[in-house]
Amino acid sequence: PPVFYGAAILILLFAAVVIGFPQRAGEWLLAAQTWASQTVGWYYLLAMTLYLIFVVVTALSGYGKIKLGADHDEPEFSYLSWAGMLFAAGISITLFFFCVSEPLTHFLQPPQGEAGTQEAARQAMELLFLHWGLHGWGVFALVAMALAYFAYRHNLPLALRSALYPLIGKRINGPIGYTVDCFGIIATVFGLGADMGFGVLQLNSGLDYLYAIPHTHPVQMALIVLMMGAAISVAVSGVDKGIRILSDINMLLACSLLLFVLFVGPTQHLLNTLVQNVGDYLGHLPGKSFDLYAYGGPSDWLGSWTVFYWAWWIAWAPFVGLFIARISRGRTIREFVFGVLFIPLGFTLAWMSIFGNSALEQALGGASELSRVAIEQPSMALYQMLQNYPWSRAVITVTVLVSFVFFVTSADSGTVVLSTLSAHGGSADDDGPKWLRVFWGSVTALVTGGLLFAGSIDALKSAVVLTSLPFSLILLLMMWGLHKAFYMESQRQRARSHSLAPLMSGNGKRSGGWKRRLSQAVHFPSRDEVYRFMNDVVRPAISEVSEVFREKGLAVDAQLDPGNASLSLEIGHGEQHRFLYQVLMRGYFTPSFARAGMGGLHLKNRRYFRAEVHLAEGSQDYDLMGYTKEQIINDMLDQYERHLQFLHLVR
């Protein structure tokens, strides 16, 4: 597919340059990042804030009631299971890398104020919360919302380009749409590569502490090959159940590590600072969202930290967004947005606060070695801090093992997402072929290794800032596409209230008087009864109407197989929204009051069936059983007139 070849060629060319000319490539990347932070740093801050505002306002508005799926879809997972999966999405190996090194760096090298003071410590935690807070999950929510909404409600491909359908229509399946997916894949590869790079440095430091394995490029390349090889093996071997169990155990170990640091360390102080950190973060969030240090502060600080973080979150958005979209079908936009924003955020901020304040407490108490390590070798800072706790060697061993498993599970998921987006970018349920997982895993390993050779942490950050820039523009177009689609949803609802026919409950559509109507209401038909009704009454009605529509010159597609439990009429309107009238046979358990009236408990498992009407947006929750052919034709025309009213409103 064009998406695969375009993305693969560009990424491989970049990897070849970085590996072939590592020193010069590192200089180019650093110069480009400096240019980007000085030239478009303001844009990154503005864009990330707009993403967050958009998803929150959408959730709080009337659009928040819209489902990510058809109107009759129910969530696939219980709320508790869904929350657990969102919780897992908030944990990655980078939490281990930055939870100690970042707050100590801000403490010792603050963008404003005097270093090494209580005020510097407070500012450090505020900046840490900013970088790991709502903004990042806002961009994840935006991408996941777009993917789920267009795939599950409008049956478009589960691809990034689908969000532009309201803007460019069927051209999403042409060069414009393929370019969108291509940029998304490129951003994801470099975001995943940065994550893997930080993970390799973190694991190398852990092995150095435990077994004196040195920090060298050959060792790091060996770790990349080992861990990516494990991830690819998991991705292609079909041992999903086993890796899920391992991942669950790993999350329990991570939570145990968090509780260990909380209760073995200065517990009261850590709880106090957690609450204060949350208050400082929320209180200063609006101002910090736009703080460019335009009136003072190190010129390169913003590019190395906030701009990098915003670019990194953007790069990870297709990866995490696709995962969240797949587990969120059937949820309303309101519960989806607030679940995505706050469930994983709670754990992330608790982790950062407890580890960050533990490190700051040691630094303020005179731990000069910890401060030195945080600046000179950030990947070793966590282990240096844990060295001051009881059973430090055992705790650090567990930390290294947990980090390794998080690396493997993240890389495994990343290769699956990349193969899905590049193979077809279409099926909402199927992943890409296994060979593509091997390919993208290998390419990501090449990119990671090349960037580590080209300049380690600085090169990783620079590549992310540059490759995320085009995709950040696409996210703004996604917002526009979603807004336009939601507006059309509201107009569709408005059109329903403008029916040109009388209300069904009051126009005598059910013939035979009130006694027959009552008998029909308390009758619970069998499967065979509904089959006969659909074959003898519904099918002729749809057939007759479809012939008339064809005579009028409209594009009609009627599915009238009498052996199928589904009959449908579809009318095309060119580039405008199609009209779909579908009758589906649906089965339900007979209610208890009816079972009692039909002879008692021996009928408790009896099912009854309905001939339900579905439109393009899903079930309309009413049953046609008992209607005559003329009444069904009138109902089709009622719905078609509502559809024409909707098309009129959105022109």
Where are the model-predicted features located?
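N-terminal alpha-helical transmembrane segments of multi-pass membrane transport
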Residues: 1-120, 486
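Loop-to-transmembrane helix boundary motifs in multi-pass membrane proteins
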Residues: 1-11, 169-178, 213-232, 236, ...
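Transmembrane-helix boundary/entry motifs in multi-pass membrane transporters
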Residues: 1-2, 37-42, 71-89, 124-134, ...
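Helix-loop-helix module between adjacent transmembrane segments
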Residues: 2-19, 52-56, 91-95, 130-201, ...
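Membrane-interface loop-to-helix entry segments
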Residues: 6, 37-43, 47-50, 180-188, ...
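Membrane-water interface regions at transmembrane-helix termini and the short interhelical loops
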Residues: 21-36, 55-76, 124-131, 146-156, ...
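Flexible loop linkers connecting adjacent transmembrane helices
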Residues: 27-33, 60-79, 104-127, 149-175, ...
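Extracellular/periplasmic helix-exit of transmembrane alpha-helices
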Residues: 98-110, 261-284, 345-377
